Amino acid sequence: MGDLAAIILAAGKGTRMKSDLVKVMHPLAGAPMVAWPVEAARQAGTSRMVLVVGHQADTIREHFAGTEQVAFALQEEQLGTGHAVASAAAALDGFTGRVLILCGDVPLIRPETLRGMIDAHGATGAALTVLTTRLENPFGYGRIIRGFDGRVIRIVEEKDATPEERGRREVNAGIYCAEAAFLFDAVTRIGNDNAQGEYYLTDIVTMANEQGLRCTAHPVADPVEVMGVNDRAQLAEAGRFARQRINRELMLDGVTIVDPAATYIDRGAVVGRDTTVHPGVHLSGETRIGEGCTIEQGAVIKGSTLGNGCVVEPGAVIRSCRLGSHVMVKAGSVMEDAIIHDHTAIGPMAHLRPGTELMAHVKIGNFVETKKITMGEGSKASHLTYLGDASIGNNVNVGCGTITCNYDGVRKHRTVIEDDVFVGSDVQFVAPVTVGRNSLIAAGTTVTRDVPPDSLAIARAPQVNKDGWKLKQRDQ
């Protein structure tokens, strides 16, 4: 394929988005819009890329900071696409290969389409190849004008076209492949004598023909690939097509998606074979789902890793977590920055806050909240409990209503519960405190001192029964 560079036009503000955020940075299925053509160009085999930036240039630079092969060119005034490409010339000084030109607001172009255009460009010996498509309603697009031999002789913008030219349905997709020597010479000679007063890149088609160079068209069958995004309605439409593409690829790889139209999976997510994804699920960020999992209705998983055989019930929310294999997350549970080992069950309606680590075969039941704790293998807290700033050993039973009192109004303190401890219901641990292994904490106890191993701790007022008291109260 030879040496290949790409110029991606991303300098426009995007007024029709009616947003404080520059258009090309609006998210599309998990990535800024401009990241899609950047990735397509990378997969097409480019060795160098130049992003032409203008409005909110620093925002775009920051997103791509550290990205290999990406350089930036500043277009301080947006004077048209020809001016934008000319702005990138210095960044490709000395480059003698072929140059792809893409638009940052045309996100759905496929790498395969770009490779096909590059191959056709080389096979025909063209100086310039224009990607085209046919539209039922071509309004707003530049029309392709061909010569008798089928070559492209010029492109006419909508506002400059005659009625006959406006009737043509083959349109310019705004994506090109050009020989670098021709391109960078041509863009220095573009004028702005047109209805918009701009420097149109399309004028280089006429220049190629005037120089006796070949200019060809490479048609793309699916117009969706070259749809532009100018407002939020079009952004939503592009998002729908992007999700269709993502979901179809996953299904062809062995994932069951019950209702693809109602399933929202970002392009960065990976889902293993034989996993079933139900309607209303959102998988976003760098999420990794193992094989044989079940993700039920309305679950939200962001930036998390799930091992094989996990089950996530309806309405669960998992953010920045790492789950082992065969973990059960029951309905309505919320987890953030937690590490969960194999064969552990969470919920329903549990809340695991940052810093939670649960070892294998742990059970966290309904209305249990944890924060900055480790819980050893086989331990369980089945219901109505708060565990914060605690280290809990193996095979510990935490009774209903247990609370670690970890905050004294100034500092947080830790509770340590060693292996094989049984904690009865309605127990408070006033930290800092340590409970030795194999101890029993009686129900209703407030623990304020360390408990030795193999001990019974009981701290509650003795029960007093007053016979006949209720009858005496009634007679008064």
Swiss-Prot record:
InterPro entries linked to this entry: Bifunctional_GlmU, GlmU-like, GlmU_C_LbH, Hexapep, MobA-like_NTP_Trfase, Nucleotide-diphossugar_trans, Trimer_LpxA-like_sf
Pfam families per record: Hexapep, NTP_transf_3
Source domain of life: Bacteria
Active site: 383
Region (Pyrophosphorylase): 1-232
Cell compartment(s), UniProt: Cytoplasm
Keyword Cell inner membrane part of the UniProt annotation: no
EC number: 2.7.7.23, 2.3.1.157
Record's cofactor remark: Binds 1 Mg(2+) ion per subunit.
Positions contributing to Mg(2+) binding: 105, 230
Linker, as annotated region: 233-253
Residues noted as binding acetyl-CoA in the record, renumbered to the chain: 406-407, 425, 443, 460
Single Gene Ontology BP annotation: lipid A biosynthetic process
Annotated Gene Ontology cellular component terms: cytoplasm; membrane
GO molecular function, one term: UDP-N-acetylglucosamine diphosphorylase activity
Annotated stretches, region: N-acetyltransferase: 254-476
Binding residues for UDP-N-acetyl-alpha-D-glucosamine: 9-12, 23, 75, 80-81, 142, 157, 172, 230, 353, 371, 386, 397
Class of enzymatic activity (EC top level): transferase
Pathway info: Nucleotide-sugar biosynthesis; UDP-N-acetyl-alpha-D-glucosamine biosynthesis; N-acetyl-alpha-D-glucosamine 1-phosphate from alpha-D-glucosamine 6-phosphate (route II): step 2/2; Nucleotide-sugar biosynthesis; UDP-N-acetyl-alpha-D-glucosamine biosynthesis; UDP-N-acetyl-alpha-D-glucosamine from N-acetyl-alpha-D-glucosamine 1-phosphate: step 1/1; Bacterial outer membrane biogenesis; LPS lipid A biosynthesis
Catalytic activity: alpha-D-glucosamine 1-phosphate + acetyl-CoA = N-acetyl-alpha-D-glucosamine 1-phosphate + CoA + H(+); N-acetyl-alpha-D-glucosamine 1-phosphate + UTP + H(+) = UDP-N-acetyl-alpha-D-glucosamine + diphosphate
HAMAP family assigned to the protein according to its UniProt record, in alphabetical order: GlmU (MF_01631)
PANTHER family, alphabetized: BIFUNCTIONAL PROTEIN GLMU, NUCLEOTIDYL TRANSFERASE
Function: Catalyzes the last two sequential reactions in the de novo biosynthetic pathway for UDP-N-acetylglucosamine (UDP-GlcNAc). The C-terminal domain catalyzes the transfer of acetyl group from acetyl coenzyme A to glucosamine-1-phosphate (GlcN-1-P) to produce N-acetylglucosamine-1-phosphate (GlcNAc-1-P), which is converted into UDP-GlcNAc by the transfer of uridine 5-monophosphate (from uridine 5-triphosphate), a reaction catalyzed by the N-terminal domain.
Known partners and oligomeric status: Homotrimer.
Protein name: Bifunctional protein GlmU
Organism: Geobacter metallireducens (strain ATCC 53774 / DSM 7210 / GS-15)
GN (gene name): glmU
